[in-house]
Amino acid sequence: MSENYTPRLKTRYREEIKKALNEEFKYENVMQIPGVTKVVVNMGVGDAARDSKMINGALEDLTAITGQKPQVRRAKKSIANFKLREGMPIGARVTLRGDRMWEFLDRLLTIALPRIRDFRGLSDQQFDGHGNYTFGLSEQTMFYEIDIDKVDRPRGMDITVVTSATNDEEGRKLLRELGFPFK
């Protein structure tokens, strides 16, 4: 990215959303205004325990969606019932920060979520008590970076938006201002 480019959602956060949050919660210090710290995209591939090629599809999908190479997550311990051995790859994870995070959130909110069939909004009950929000997507085809013809099987993913908010009320207000479509 060029050095003078700023993602549009980041610009909106700095110019409009920070002021709105400060007016509502009346912070004493501007550093108390909540912001988005990072976004973690996790794709669990339990079938990779039986077929090690399954993880490659998840890695390619996550790379296309986020623009960043995923980290392979391995099993911490062996579980005989799941035919799982310690060290086997069972998932992939990407942590987005900075401009890549703002670009991903912008694409998620404006392009990907509206493409979900029968989408009625995200639940606003999935906050963790500290202002962080986690939600799941059932398949990866809603992202336009994924070529639907090349998808071997639908894979879901978990997306966690980590904020610097101290409680759920502040986190909910921040994400609603950013454009998250809560029910």
Swiss-Prot record:
It comes from the Bacteria. NCBIfam families: PRK00010.1 (NF000585). This is Large ribosomal subunit protein uL5. One of its GO terms (biological process) is translation. The keyword Ribonucleoprotein applies. Part of the 50S ribosomal subunit; part of the 5S rRNA/L5/L18/L25 subcomplex. Contacts the 5S rRNA and the P site tRNA. Forms a bridge to the 30S subunit in the 70S ribosome. This is one of the proteins that bind and probably mediate the attachment of the 5S RNA into the large ribosomal subunit, where it forms part of the central protuberance. In the 70S ribosome it contacts protein S13 of the 30S subunit (bridge B1b), connecting the 2 subunits; this bridge is implicated in subunit movement. Contacts the P site tRNA; the 5S rRNA and some of its associated proteins might help stabilize positioning of ribosome-bound tRNAs. Keywords: Ribonucleoprotein, Ribosomal protein, RNA-binding, rRNA-binding, tRNA-binding. The keyword Phosphoprotein does not apply. One of its GO terms (cellular component) is ribosome. GO terms for molecular function: rRNA binding; structural constituent of ribosome; tRNA binding. Belongs to the universal ribosomal protein uL5 family.
